[in-house]
């Protein structure tokens, strides 16, 4: 589970409303996805992100269909699996960026504590796009995790 939480935002609807307004407000005001991406991506990445990664993420977000983006944002704010989290018994690897404000490390750590078989990692200087910002680090964490899981099954 990379840069995610068991539910969107807190239990306060004001966060959801602010999240939607920040993402859809510029589109409602006439901006296109490319313009929104230039604002949104720098706000969610950490200092570890390279200039090239930043530009690639901006370009990728800029190509998202606006209607699809609106639907994604509307759906995202309804996500809530807190009540089901305890049902996950298989091994889980949780990875957070230390600078991620969308899926904060403290929230992911709490989620890991609520899972029966979880490991939790924080990637220093990474933001919400942790796997793109620090791919070698994330790949090393995942490789070690998969090797541990495989060795337990073989043993």
Stretches with model-predicted labels:
Residues 1-29, 37-38:
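Flexible "cap/lid" loop of the alpha/beta hydrolase fold
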Residues 74, 90, 104-113:
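Short alpha-helix in the alpha/beta-hydrolase fold that links the catalytic acid
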Residues 40, 73-76, 111, 138, ...:
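Hydrophobic "lid"/C-terminal helical patch
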Residues 17, 38, 42, 54-55, ...:
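Short, surface-exposed alpha-helical segments at coil->helix boundaries
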Residues 63, 79, 101-102, 129-133:
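A short, basic/aromatic alpha-helical/loop segment that forms part
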Residues 117-155:
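Catalytic active-site module of serine/aspartate enzymes centered on a nucleophile-bearing elbow/loop
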Residues 88, 94-96, 100:
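Short beta-strand/loop motif that positions the catalytic acidic residue
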């Amino acid at each position: 589970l990379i840069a995610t939480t068991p539910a969107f935002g807190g239990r306060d609807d004001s966060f959801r409303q602010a999240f939607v307004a920040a993402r859809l407000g510029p589109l409602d005001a006439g901006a296109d996805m490319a313009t929104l991406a230039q604002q949104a991506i720098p706000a969610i990445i950490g200092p570890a992100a390279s200039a090239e990664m930043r530009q690639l993420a901006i370009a990728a977000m800029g190509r998202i269909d606006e209607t699809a983006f609106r639907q994604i944002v509307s759906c995202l704010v309804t996500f809530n699996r807190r009540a089901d989290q305890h049902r996950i018994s298989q091994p889980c690897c949780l990875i957070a960026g230390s600078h991620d404000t969308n899926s904060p490390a403290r929230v992911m750590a709490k989620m890991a504590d609520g899972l029966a078989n979880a490991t939790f990692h924080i990637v220093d200087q990474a933001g919400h796009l942790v796997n793109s910002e620090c791919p070698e680090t994330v790949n090393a964490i995942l490789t070690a995790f998969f090797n541990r899981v495989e060795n337990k099954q073989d043993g």
